[in-house]
Every structure is written in C-alpha cells, then in structure tokens.
Amino acid sequence: EKHGIEVKHELPGVGENLQDHFMVAVQHGVNRGVTLGCDGQFPRVVLNVFKYLFTKRGPLAFPAANVGVFFKGEGDTRPSFQIHFTPGAGDMDEHGNTAPADQPGVNSTTCLLRPESRGHVHIRSTDPKSPPAIQYNYLSTEYDRRRTVEGVKWQRKIYAAKPFQEIATTEIKLGAHVQTDEQILDYCRKEGSSVYHPIGTCKMGAASDPMAVVDNELRVHGLHALRVVDASIFPYLISGNTHAPTVAVAEKAADLIL
C-alpha cells in the first residue's frame, strides 16, 4: 500500500524469512605448483583457451571449486559446516568479477549450513523492473557469529596441517594480524559474501501459521489456482546446495498440476 498498489490479498509472510548461506574465505600462498591464478594470466590463459577448444582439457574443463567437505564443529552430532576448496587465490569486486592474486595461492570458503539469521525482500516501487530491496541480515544472531568464527578457525587448522605446511608461504587472507575472535568476526563482516542459496520468502506451512504462504501442495493460502514453485517455499535452509531440492520441488509440482 505504501507504494500505491491496491492490496487484493494480504499474506504478511511474503518476502519475509529470507535465508542464505554466508561464506567466508581463507587464502594461503604456496611456493610451488601451478594455481588457477597462474593459469589465468598471460600467456598461460591464451594457451589454456586453445587447449580447451581442441582437447576439452585443462583448467577450463573443471569447476572452480574442486573439493567440497561437510564437517562437524564443536559439539555437533551432524555436519554444521561446508567447505569449498579452489586451487587459486584472488579478489572479487562489487560486480562479482574475480582478479587473480599477485602470488600463487589457494582458497577455501566455509559456510554455516543452518544459520539462524533471517532477512527479507521488499519491492521499492510500482516499477516491476526496479531492483527489490534485499536485506539478508547476515550474522544477526549470536549463534551465527560464534559458529562462523568457528568455521574460519577450522579452515586455519587445515592449512596448519603438516602436508600443507610443506608448500605453504604466507596467509593472504585473513592475514597473520587477525587472531582474536573479535578480529575474525570483523573480517567476516567485511569480506564475507553469499553462496547464492537464497530461500524461504514464500515458505510452506499450515494455514494456522501467520507467516506461511503456501500449503503442502504449493498452493498460496487463501487464493485459487495460484502456486509457488521455487526455492522460496522452503521453510528452512537446506544443509547443502539448493539446486537439487529445487528441481525436486518442480518435479513434484508437475505431478500435482498434471
């Protein structure tokens, strides 16, 4: 209503309950081997383009994240963290473009699988092409802050292991000067980013739940012949990647509709 749009049906849960995986990177320099940073610089990048075109091999033939790990933290009975590992280091700008670091290195990111923080997505105007106002509210609970710092410490433990120390040089990120929990948390706030797993803004739930948007057949509460079929119907964040469960929702929706 504040944007001059007539309300036909009110569901306060629409746009609320936004959840996402929040990742934090640790990068370490290495003293030997060829990393993606090296492969992305001239003249190797040109050679790698032709290598892929003619042989479908080389660094362009495999994903950036080569290793994934689910692991338990302090007191956990099931995995609470996910790590992605990349044989390259670099920086990402505000547009999502990545530039290689000025030295050979490797990168890992960790995310808390079941965060408590909740955000929202709201419209800004009557213009459907206008970008919405997206507020994730990352690290807005004590639990999320504490567990995210714990995840960063686990990454450092991996890099401190003897096999890696044989090729390690300096820690590029966080940096040796970042040691206390408060310093690590400050780094997380400045350097953390999305894993691109947003869900929950049209959550499934019983009609008695004032924040529920759809029922167990994906039908919008209180409306006829309207369903929502995407990741927004998940009440809680998936403990892993969201693509496969979203495909499963679409397949189920096809069965319900047809």
What are these regions (language model features)?
Residues 30-35, 47-245, 253-258:
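FAD-dependent oxidoreductase catalytic-site/capping-region signature
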Residues 1-55, 59:
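Glycine-rich loop(s) and the adjacent beta-strand/alpha-helix scaffold that form part
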